[in-house]
Amino acid sequence: MSEAGEATTTTTTTLPQAPTEAAAAAPQDPAPKSPVGSGAPQAAAPAPAAHVAGNPGGDAAPAATGTAAAASLATAAGSEDAEKKVLATKVLGTVKWFNVRNGYGFINRNDTKEDVFVHQTAIKKNNPRKYLRSVGDGETVEFDVVEGEKGAEAANVTGPDGVPVEGSRYAADRRRYRRGYYGRRRGPPRNYAGEEEEEGSGSSEGFDPPATDRQFSGARNQLRRPQYRPQYRQRRFPPYHVGQTFDRRSRVLPHPNRIQAGEIGEMKDGVPEGAQLQGPVHRNPTYRPRYRSRGPPRPRPAPAVGEAEDKENQQATSGPNQPSVRRGYRRPYNYRRRPRPPNAPSQDGKEAKAGEAPTENPAPPTQQSSAE
Protein backbone atom coordinates (compact mmCIF):
# COMPACT_ATOMS: atom_id res chain seq x y z
CA MET A 1 0.00 0.00 0.00
CA SER A 2 2.78 2.40 0.78
CA GLU A 3 4.48 1.86 -2.59
CA ALA A 4 1.21 2.51 -4.41
CA GLY A 5 0.67 5.75 -2.47
CA GLU A 6 4.17 6.97 -3.28
CA ALA A 7 3.61 6.26 -6.95
CA THR A 8 0.34 8.22 -6.91
CA THR A 9 1.97 11.24 -5.27
CA THR A 10 4.78 11.22 -7.77
CA THR A 11 2.34 11.14 -10.66
CA THR A 12 0.23 13.98 -9.20
CA THR A 13 3.27 16.16 -8.65
CA THR A 14 4.59 15.65 -12.15
CA LEU A 15 1.29 16.48 -13.91
CA PRO A 16 0.92 20.23 -13.07
CA GLN A 17 4.44 21.15 -14.21
CA ALA A 18 4.68 24.27 -16.26
CA PRO A 19 5.74 24.04 -19.90
CA THR A 20 8.78 26.20 -19.21
CA GLU A 21 10.00 23.79 -16.54
CA ALA A 22 9.45 20.91 -18.89
CA ALA A 23 11.42 22.69 -21.55
CA ALA A 24 14.18 23.44 -19.07
CA ALA A 25 14.29 19.86 -17.84
CA ALA A 26 14.45 18.45 -21.36
CA PRO A 27 18.07 19.43 -22.12
CA GLN A 28 19.29 17.81 -18.88
CA ASP A 29 18.34 14.33 -20.07
CA PRO A 30 21.02 12.71 -22.14
CA ALA A 31 20.29 12.89 -25.84
CA PRO A 32 19.55 9.54 -27.48
CA LYS A 33 22.36 8.10 -29.44
CA SER A 34 21.73 8.05 -33.15
CA PRO A 35 23.47 5.78 -35.60
CA VAL A 36 24.77 8.84 -37.48
CA GLY A 37 26.85 9.86 -34.50
CA SER A 38 27.90 13.50 -34.11
CA GLY A 39 25.54 14.87 -36.78
CA ALA A 40 22.38 14.78 -34.64
CA PRO A 41 23.39 17.30 -31.96
CA GLN A 42 24.35 19.86 -34.66
CA ALA A 43 20.91 19.61 -36.25
CA ALA A 44 19.09 19.93 -32.93
CA ALA A 45 20.99 23.07 -31.84
CA PRO A 46 19.06 25.73 -33.88
CA ALA A 47 15.72 24.73 -32.30
CA PRO A 48 15.89 27.18 -29.33
CA ALA A 49 16.75 30.07 -31.64
CA ALA A 50 13.71 29.34 -33.80
CA HIS A 51 11.55 29.24 -30.69
CA VAL A 52 12.77 32.65 -29.53
CA ALA A 53 12.25 34.22 -32.96
CA GLY A 54 8.74 32.82 -33.16
CA ASN A 55 7.80 34.01 -29.66
CA PRO A 56 5.38 36.95 -29.97
CA GLY A 57 6.64 38.49 -26.71
CA GLY A 58 10.30 38.39 -27.68
CA ASP A 59 12.42 41.50 -28.33
CA ALA A 60 14.67 40.13 -31.00
CA ALA A 61 12.45 41.03 -34.02
CA PRO A 62 11.75 44.74 -33.17
CA ALA A 63 15.40 45.41 -32.51
CA ALA A 64 16.31 44.07 -35.89
CA THR A 65 13.60 46.19 -37.58
CA GLY A 66 14.77 49.47 -35.93
CA THR A 67 18.34 48.81 -36.91
CA ALA A 68 17.34 48.29 -40.53
CA ALA A 69 15.35 51.58 -40.61
CA ALA A 70 18.25 53.55 -39.15
CA ALA A 71 20.57 52.07 -41.69
CA SER A 72 18.24 53.04 -44.56
CA LEU A 73 17.97 56.66 -43.30
CA ALA A 74 21.71 56.96 -43.02
CA THR A 75 22.08 55.66 -46.53
CA ALA A 76 19.54 58.20 -47.85
CA ALA A 77 21.26 61.05 -46.01
CA GLY A 78 24.57 59.98 -47.39
CA SER A 79 23.14 59.90 -50.90
CA GLU A 80 21.70 63.44 -50.50
CA ASP A 81 25.00 64.74 -49.19
CA ALA A 82 26.68 63.11 -52.10
CA GLU A 83 24.20 64.81 -54.51
CA LYS A 84 24.45 68.31 -52.88
CA LYS A 85 28.18 68.46 -52.61
CA VAL A 86 29.39 71.98 -51.70
CA LEU A 87 31.81 73.34 -54.31
CA ALA A 88 32.31 76.93 -53.02
CA THR A 89 31.01 79.21 -50.28
CA LYS A 90 30.28 82.94 -50.12
CA VAL A 91 30.68 83.53 -53.80
CA LEU A 92 29.70 86.91 -55.27
CA GLY A 93 27.78 87.04 -58.50
CA THR A 94 25.44 89.12 -60.65
CA VAL A 95 21.91 87.99 -61.44
CA LYS A 96 21.66 87.35 -65.17
CA TRP A 97 17.89 86.95 -65.24
CA PHE A 98 15.17 85.65 -62.96
CA ASN A 99 11.58 84.70 -63.82
CA VAL A 100 9.24 85.49 -60.93
CA ARG A 101 6.34 83.42 -62.26
CA ASN A 102 8.39 80.27 -62.82
CA GLY A 103 10.55 80.88 -59.78
CA TYR A 104 14.03 80.28 -61.19
CA GLY A 105 16.86 82.05 -63.01
CA PHE A 106 20.65 82.19 -63.42
CA ILE A 107 23.46 83.98 -61.62
CA ASN A 108 26.80 84.76 -63.28
CA ARG A 109 29.75 84.19 -60.97
CA ASN A 110 32.18 87.08 -60.75
CA ASP A 111 35.26 84.89 -60.28
CA THR A 112 34.80 82.23 -62.98
CA LYS A 113 32.13 83.93 -65.16
CA GLU A 114 30.08 80.75 -64.95
CA ASP A 115 26.28 80.70 -64.95
CA VAL A 116 24.80 79.06 -61.87
CA PHE A 117 21.18 77.91 -61.66
CA VAL A 118 19.17 79.46 -58.81
CA HIS A 119 15.70 78.51 -57.58
CA GLN A 120 13.42 80.64 -55.42
CA THR A 121 13.68 78.10 -52.58
CA ALA A 122 17.44 78.74 -52.41
CA ILE A 123 16.92 82.40 -51.42
CA LYS A 124 17.68 82.56 -47.70
CA LYS A 125 16.95 86.24 -46.89
CA ASN A 126 14.19 87.76 -48.98
CA ASN A 127 13.13 91.39 -49.11
CA PRO A 128 10.60 91.82 -46.25
CA ARG A 129 8.47 94.15 -48.40
CA LYS A 130 8.08 91.55 -51.14
CA TYR A 131 5.38 88.92 -51.12
CA LEU A 132 7.36 86.29 -53.10
CA ARG A 133 10.99 85.26 -53.01
CA SER A 134 12.94 86.64 -55.94
CA VAL A 135 16.15 88.39 -57.02
CA GLY A 136 16.33 91.37 -59.34
CA ASP A 137 18.01 91.46 -62.73
CA GLY A 138 21.57 92.84 -62.42
CA GLU A 139 21.56 92.58 -58.61
CA THR A 140 24.74 91.55 -56.81
CA VAL A 141 24.20 88.58 -54.50
CA GLU A 142 26.23 86.28 -52.31
CA PHE A 143 25.63 82.53 -52.41
CA ASP A 144 27.09 79.04 -52.02
CA VAL A 145 27.72 76.79 -54.98
CA VAL A 146 26.61 73.17 -54.69
CA GLU A 147 26.64 70.36 -57.17
CA GLY A 148 23.16 69.53 -58.51
CA GLU A 149 21.76 66.89 -60.80
CA LYS A 150 22.35 68.93 -63.98
CA GLY A 151 25.19 71.18 -62.91
CA ALA A 152 26.14 73.84 -60.38
CA GLU A 153 23.34 75.31 -58.31
CA ALA A 154 23.17 78.25 -55.92
CA ALA A 155 22.21 77.83 -52.26
CA ASN A 156 21.82 80.19 -49.29
CA VAL A 157 21.38 83.21 -51.55
CA THR A 158 21.60 86.58 -49.73
CA GLY A 159 22.77 90.08 -50.43
CA PRO A 160 26.38 91.18 -49.94
CA ASP A 161 27.56 90.55 -46.35
CA GLY A 162 24.38 88.60 -45.54
CA VAL A 163 21.83 91.41 -46.00
CA PRO A 164 18.40 90.64 -47.52
CA VAL A 165 18.16 90.71 -51.30
CA GLU A 166 16.36 93.57 -53.05
CA GLY A 167 14.12 91.32 -55.11
CA SER A 168 12.66 91.68 -58.57
CA ARG A 169 10.64 94.75 -59.49
CA TYR A 170 8.01 92.45 -60.98
CA ALA A 171 7.43 90.66 -57.67
CA ALA A 172 4.27 91.62 -55.78
CA ASP A 173 4.65 93.85 -52.75
CA ARG A 174 3.01 93.20 -49.42
CA ARG A 175 0.03 95.24 -48.24
CA ARG A 176 1.18 98.49 -46.73
CA TYR A 177 -1.75 99.33 -44.45
CA ARG A 178 -1.80 97.94 -40.95
CA ARG A 179 -4.29 95.33 -39.88
CA GLY A 180 -7.44 96.93 -38.51
CA TYR A 181 -6.45 100.43 -39.68
CA TYR A 182 -9.65 101.00 -41.65
CA GLY A 183 -11.82 99.33 -39.01
CA ARG A 184 -11.05 101.84 -36.28
CA ARG A 185 -13.86 104.00 -34.92
CA ARG A 186 -13.29 107.58 -35.93
CA GLY A 187 -14.42 109.96 -33.24
CA PRO A 188 -13.21 112.40 -30.63
CA PRO A 189 -10.16 111.24 -28.68
CA ARG A 190 -10.85 109.36 -25.50
CA ASN A 191 -10.02 110.91 -22.15
CA TYR A 192 -7.20 109.25 -20.28
CA ALA A 193 -7.93 108.26 -16.70
CA GLY A 194 -4.54 109.48 -15.46
CA GLU A 195 -5.03 112.99 -16.85
CA GLU A 196 -8.50 113.29 -15.34
CA GLU A 197 -7.15 112.31 -11.93
CA GLU A 198 -4.34 114.86 -12.20
CA GLU A 199 -6.76 117.63 -13.13
CA GLY A 200 -9.16 116.68 -10.34
CA SER A 201 -6.41 116.62 -7.72
CA GLY A 202 -5.17 120.09 -8.72
CA SER A 203 -8.63 121.64 -8.54
CA SER A 204 -9.50 120.02 -5.21
CA GLU A 205 -6.41 121.28 -3.42
CA GLY A 206 -7.39 124.88 -4.19
CA PHE A 207 -4.23 126.29 -5.84
CA ASP A 208 -3.25 126.87 -9.45
CA PRO A 209 -0.05 125.37 -10.90
CA PRO A 210 2.69 127.78 -11.98
CA ALA A 211 2.86 129.12 -15.54
CA THR A 212 5.76 126.86 -16.54
CA ASP A 213 3.84 123.76 -15.46
CA ARG A 214 0.87 124.91 -17.49
CA GLN A 215 3.02 125.26 -20.59
CA PHE A 216 4.52 121.79 -20.18
CA SER A 217 1.14 120.23 -19.46
CA GLY A 218 -0.39 121.95 -22.49
CA ALA A 219 2.38 120.69 -24.76
CA ARG A 220 2.00 117.20 -23.32
CA ASN A 221 -1.75 117.22 -23.90
CA GLN A 222 -1.24 118.33 -27.48
CA LEU A 223 1.14 115.44 -28.06
CA ARG A 224 -1.17 112.91 -26.46
CA ARG A 225 -4.49 114.18 -27.74
CA PRO A 226 -4.60 114.95 -31.47
CA GLN A 227 -6.91 117.76 -32.44
CA TYR A 228 -10.20 116.42 -33.76
CA ARG A 229 -11.96 118.51 -36.32
CA PRO A 230 -15.24 117.16 -37.63
CA GLN A 231 -15.73 117.26 -41.36
CA TYR A 232 -19.26 118.61 -41.13
CA ARG A 233 -21.37 120.54 -38.65
CA GLN A 234 -24.53 119.16 -37.18
CA ARG A 235 -27.37 121.65 -36.83
CA ARG A 236 -30.64 120.58 -35.36
CA PHE A 237 -32.58 123.75 -36.20
CA PRO A 238 -32.16 126.58 -38.74
CA PRO A 239 -30.35 129.69 -37.51
CA TYR A 240 -33.47 131.88 -37.51
CA HIS A 241 -34.86 129.91 -34.54
CA VAL A 242 -31.89 130.83 -32.34
CA GLY A 243 -32.47 133.68 -29.89
CA GLN A 244 -36.24 133.93 -30.41
CA THR A 245 -39.19 133.25 -28.15
CA PHE A 246 -42.76 132.44 -29.16
CA ASP A 247 -46.01 133.45 -27.47
CA ARG A 248 -49.62 132.45 -28.02
CA ARG A 249 -50.26 135.19 -30.58
CA SER A 250 -47.43 133.89 -32.77
CA ARG A 251 -45.45 137.09 -32.39
CA VAL A 252 -41.72 136.71 -32.71
CA LEU A 253 -39.98 138.46 -29.86
CA PRO A 254 -36.22 138.85 -29.53
CA HIS A 255 -34.19 137.21 -26.84
CA PRO A 256 -34.08 139.18 -23.54
CA ASN A 257 -30.27 139.33 -23.69
CA ARG A 258 -30.50 141.23 -26.97
CA ILE A 259 -32.92 143.74 -25.42
CA GLN A 260 -30.55 144.40 -22.52
CA ALA A 261 -27.62 144.89 -24.89
CA GLY A 262 -29.54 147.68 -26.66
CA GLU A 263 -29.68 146.07 -30.09
CA ILE A 264 -33.44 146.73 -30.34
CA GLY A 265 -35.26 150.04 -29.78
CA GLU A 266 -37.81 150.97 -27.16
CA MET A 267 -40.99 149.09 -26.47
CA LYS A 268 -44.20 150.44 -28.00
CA ASP A 269 -47.59 148.95 -27.12
CA GLY A 270 -45.88 145.94 -25.60
CA VAL A 271 -43.98 145.21 -28.84
CA PRO A 272 -40.43 146.44 -29.50
CA GLU A 273 -39.75 148.56 -32.56
CA GLY A 274 -37.35 146.10 -34.15
CA ALA A 275 -39.72 143.16 -33.71
CA GLN A 276 -41.96 142.19 -36.57
CA LEU A 277 -45.32 140.55 -36.41
CA GLN A 278 -45.29 137.34 -38.36
CA GLY A 279 -47.67 134.53 -39.03
CA PRO A 280 -47.67 131.28 -37.09
CA VAL A 281 -44.13 130.00 -36.79
CA HIS A 282 -43.63 126.27 -36.76
CA ARG A 283 -40.86 124.72 -34.71
CA ASN A 284 -40.53 121.75 -37.03
CA PRO A 285 -37.78 122.62 -39.57
CA THR A 286 -39.22 120.16 -42.13
CA TYR A 287 -42.60 121.96 -42.24
CA ARG A 288 -43.65 123.26 -45.64
CA PRO A 289 -46.76 125.46 -46.03
CA ARG A 290 -49.38 124.56 -48.58
CA TYR A 291 -49.14 126.12 -52.00
CA ARG A 292 -51.49 129.05 -52.52
CA SER A 293 -51.90 130.63 -55.94
CA ARG A 294 -51.42 134.40 -55.86
CA GLY A 295 -53.62 135.39 -58.80
CA PRO A 296 -55.96 138.35 -59.27
CA PRO A 297 -58.79 138.62 -56.69
CA ARG A 298 -62.02 136.98 -57.64
CA PRO A 299 -64.88 139.39 -58.50
CA ARG A 300 -67.72 139.38 -56.02
CA PRO A 301 -71.20 138.60 -57.38
CA ALA A 302 -73.58 141.54 -57.77
CA PRO A 303 -76.18 141.79 -54.99
CA ALA A 304 -79.76 140.80 -55.74
CA VAL A 305 -82.61 143.31 -56.09
CA GLY A 306 -84.10 142.49 -52.68
CA GLU A 307 -80.73 142.87 -50.95
CA ALA A 308 -80.17 146.31 -52.52
CA GLU A 309 -83.55 147.49 -51.25
CA ASP A 310 -82.81 146.17 -47.75
CA LYS A 311 -79.52 148.08 -47.64
CA GLU A 312 -81.29 151.30 -48.67
CA ASN A 313 -83.95 150.80 -45.98
CA GLN A 314 -81.27 150.21 -43.34
CA GLN A 315 -79.47 153.41 -44.28
CA ALA A 316 -82.74 155.35 -44.09
CA THR A 317 -83.81 153.94 -40.72
CA SER A 318 -80.39 154.27 -39.06
CA GLY A 319 -79.52 157.73 -37.80
CA PRO A 320 -76.26 159.57 -38.31
CA ASN A 321 -75.01 158.68 -34.82
CA GLN A 322 -75.77 154.98 -35.05
CA PRO A 323 -72.90 152.67 -35.98
CA SER A 324 -73.02 151.13 -39.40
CA VAL A 325 -73.81 147.48 -39.82
CA ARG A 326 -70.69 145.42 -40.29
CA ARG A 327 -69.90 144.35 -43.79
CA GLY A 328 -70.63 140.96 -45.13
CA TYR A 329 -73.75 140.49 -43.01
CA ARG A 330 -76.62 138.73 -44.69
CA ARG A 331 -80.09 138.28 -43.37
CA PRO A 332 -81.59 134.86 -43.07
CA TYR A 333 -83.19 133.46 -46.14
CA ASN A 334 -86.68 133.45 -44.60
CA TYR A 335 -86.73 137.23 -44.08
CA ARG A 336 -85.66 138.19 -47.56
CA ARG A 337 -88.95 137.84 -49.46
CA ARG A 338 -91.42 138.74 -46.71
CA PRO A 339 -93.25 142.02 -47.36
CA ARG A 340 -92.65 144.47 -44.55
CA PRO A 341 -95.60 146.51 -43.21
CA PRO A 342 -95.12 150.29 -43.15
CA ASN A 343 -95.00 150.64 -39.33
CA ALA A 344 -93.12 147.39 -38.58
CA PRO A 345 -90.17 147.58 -36.17
CA SER A 346 -86.71 147.50 -37.65
CA GLN A 347 -84.20 144.76 -37.20
CA ASP A 348 -82.68 146.37 -34.12
CA GLY A 349 -86.07 146.34 -32.25
CA LYS A 350 -86.69 150.09 -32.48
CA GLU A 351 -89.91 151.50 -33.91
CA ALA A 352 -89.84 153.67 -36.92
CA LYS A 353 -89.81 157.36 -36.19
CA ALA A 354 -92.95 159.46 -36.72
CA GLY A 355 -91.24 162.05 -38.90
CA GLU A 356 -90.01 159.45 -41.38
CA ALA A 357 -92.09 158.80 -44.44
CA PRO A 358 -93.57 155.33 -44.92
CA THR A 359 -91.69 152.97 -47.10
CA GLU A 360 -94.61 152.50 -49.52
CA ASN A 361 -95.80 155.80 -51.00
CA PRO A 362 -99.62 156.19 -51.36
CA ALA A 363 -101.22 156.78 -54.68
CA PRO A 364 -101.20 160.41 -55.96
CA PRO A 365 -104.33 162.51 -55.11
CA THR A 366 -105.16 163.08 -58.71
CA GLN A 367 -105.65 159.40 -59.22
CA GLN A 368 -107.80 159.15 -56.07
CA SER A 369 -110.07 162.01 -57.13
CA SER A 370 -110.52 160.55 -60.51
CA ALA A 371 -111.35 157.25 -58.98
CA GLU A 372 -114.01 158.83 -56.80
From Swiss-Prot:
Residue ranges annotated for the CSD domain, each copy included: 93-157
Record keyword Cytoplasm present: yes
Modified residues (Phosphoserine): 2, 34, 134, 201, 203-204, 324, 346, 369-370
Keywords: Acetylation, Cytoplasm, DNA-binding, Methylation, Nucleus, Phosphoprotein, Repressor, Transcription, Transcription regulation
InterPro entries: Cold_shock_domain (IPR050181), CSD (IPR011129), CSD_CS (IPR019844), CSP_DNA-bd (IPR002059), NA-bd_OB-fold (IPR012340)
Regions of compositional bias (Polar residues) in chain numbering: 314-324
UniProt GO cellular component terms: bicellular tight junction; cytoplasm; cytosol; nucleus; perinuclear region of cytoplasm; synapse
Bias kind Basic residues: ranges: 222-238, 327-340
First-listed, main subcellular location of the protein, grouped into a coarse class: cytoplasm
Keyword Phosphoprotein in annotation: yes
Disordered, as annotated region: 1-82, 181-372
Function comment: Binds to the GM-CSF promoter. Seems to act as a repressor. Also binds to full-length mRNA and to short RNA sequences containing the consensus site 5'-UCCAUCA-3'. May have a role in translation repression.
Designated name of the protein: Y-box-binding protein 3
Lineage: Eukaryota, Metazoa, Chordata, Craniata, Vertebrata
